[in-house]
């Protein structure tokens, strides 16, 4: 039986079936490269970054050469399939520029953020960086530079730049107070995560920390744009997750690739080059072009491949729905429908792109935690729909039960929170919190979290890169 031929070149055997079209490996590579490059050339700002500049009516030859040298982008690399594929296509773009122009129009800084966890993970990261820089991308070793950053560096700054942010359990308002020496000495990402009982809250905190450090790195190092490796599928699950978490008002700003990031000095833009590419297509690319060996804590899907990677799925390893975070539930939903109903994913993303940011009735106020605009007085709204004030003890039985509760672990924690709350409300300053972060902080023990200040001094606090050797 003769193997089917690619519908594009009509020469090579089919290796991928996507969007009802048959592709050979090379035609599929061109297909996804064109979609990524379309986003990379989506407006004049990005074209000025990625194109090789020459002398013209606007710039001299020297100015054009300087612009080519100064055009630097930042790629956060998680060693998942999407960021790896995006970096691979950027590498191929640089090679093409060298062949056609004998020079390149931009340079790439790759940032790997990691948590202090286990030696095996750090060894894998170190091994991947070495092989990518010296083997796979050796032809662009002068244009692609790798950097590592520990997430703990979020809190490894001067004590004066970190405050204790506390949520009032009845008023749903926030205040902050400076942390003391002992609290600062013991502060790390792990201590913050330890105070988060549920996985969704931990995931939110890690996401806040990672994005802040990536953007802070771009702010300090003069990058023109951050290229986030989010596929169409990932962006769709981000949109749904934002709605579920009460962050729907932030969707427009999250997807904004047109404006400079005002929360970080308006020095760079955020771009999603893979927004027209499905996650299954990303995974197929990684499988076909030998990127799977660089994956860390990620398993490729092979639903689009003619030659499957595996014959059976291990159902026993799948996480139960009740143990999933909100993001994982949304991701599972889109993974399940991507094969038959990929148009649903595209519809979700198109709808998200059409959303405008709500009118800010409170003026220019930003959330103390996530930096998003606070549009309405959500604290007042929450007070109007909830009752959190306790009733006085009336009977002896109620007093006895309250005494037992007060000496329990939960009772002691609650008493400690009341003491902290009263001190902060007496000594601290008011802060603004968005609805999503009020929900997140309610998932933290004692409703408080140590957090860096939102000011220029904190942004200019130099980040220390880490060596994994």
From Swiss-Prot:
SUPFAM superfamilies registered for this protein in UniProt: Adenine nucleotide alpha hydrolases-like
Localization per record: Cytoplasm
Recorded GO CC terms: cytosol
Superkingdom classification of source: Eukaryota
Primary location recorded for the protein, binned into one broad class: cytoplasm
Record flagged with keyword rRNA-binding: no
HAMAP family to which the protein is assigned, alphabetical: CTU2
Name of this chain's protein: Cytoplasmic tRNA 2-thiolation protein 2
Protein encoded by which gene: NCS2
């Amino acid at each position: 039986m003769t193997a089917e031929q690619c519908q594009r070149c009509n020469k090579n055997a089919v290796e991928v079936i996507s969007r009802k079209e048959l592709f050979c490996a090379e035609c599929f590579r061109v297909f996804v490269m064109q979609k990524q490059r379309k986003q990379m050339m989506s407006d004049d700002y990005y074209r000025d970054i990625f194109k090789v500049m020459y002398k013209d009516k606007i710039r001299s030859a020297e100015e054009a050469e300087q612009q080519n040298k100064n055009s630097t982008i930042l790629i956060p690399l998680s060693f998942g399939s999407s960021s790896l594929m995006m970096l691979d296509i950027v590498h191929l773009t640089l090679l093409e520029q060298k062949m056609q122009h004998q020079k390149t129009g931009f340079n790439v800084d790759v940032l790997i953020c990691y948590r202090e966890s286990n030696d095996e993970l750090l060894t894998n990261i170190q091994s991947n960086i070495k092989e990518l820089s010296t083997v796979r991308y050796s032809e662009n070793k002068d244009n692609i530079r790798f950097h590592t950053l520990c997430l703990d560096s979020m809190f490894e700054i001067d004590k004066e730049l970190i405050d204790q942010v506390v949520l009032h359990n009845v008023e749903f308002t926030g205040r902050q107070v400076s942390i003391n020496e002992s609290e600062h000495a013991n502060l790390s990402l792990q201590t913050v995560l330890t105070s988060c009982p549920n996985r969704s809250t931990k995931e939110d905190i890690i996401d806040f920390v990672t994005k802040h450090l990536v953007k802070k790195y771009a702010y300090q190092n003069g990058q023109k744009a951050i290229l986030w490796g989010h596929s169409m599928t990932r962006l769709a699950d981000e949109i749904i997750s934002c709605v579920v978490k009460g962050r729907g008002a932030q969707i427009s700003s999250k997807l904004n690739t047109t404006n400079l990031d005002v929360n970080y000095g308006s020095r760079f833009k955020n771009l999603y080059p893979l927004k027209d590419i499905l996650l299954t297509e990303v995974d197929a690319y990684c499988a076909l072009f030998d990127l799977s060996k660089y994956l860390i804590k990620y398993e490729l899907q092979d639903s689009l491949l003619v030659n499957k990677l595996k014959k059976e799925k291990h159902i026993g390893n799948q996480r139960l729905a009740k143990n999933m975070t909100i993001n994982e539930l949304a991701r599972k939903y889109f993974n399940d429908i991507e094969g038959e109903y990929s148009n649903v994913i595209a519809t979700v993303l198109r709808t998200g792109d059409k959303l405008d940011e709500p009118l800010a009735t409170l003026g220019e106020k930003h959330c103390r935690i996530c930096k998003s605009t606070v549009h309405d007085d959500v604290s007042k709204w929450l007070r109007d729909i909830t009752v959190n004030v306790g009733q006085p003890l009336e009977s002896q039985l109620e007093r006895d039960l309250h005494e037992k509760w007060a000496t329990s672990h939960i009772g002691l924690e609650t008493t400690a929170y009341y003491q902290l709350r009263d001190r902060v409300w007496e000594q601290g300053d008011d802060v603004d919190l968005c609805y999503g972060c009020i929900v997140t902080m309610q998932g933290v023990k004692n409703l408080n979290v140590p957090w860096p200040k939102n000011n220029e001094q904190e942004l200019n606090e130099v980040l220390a890169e880490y060596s994994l050797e």
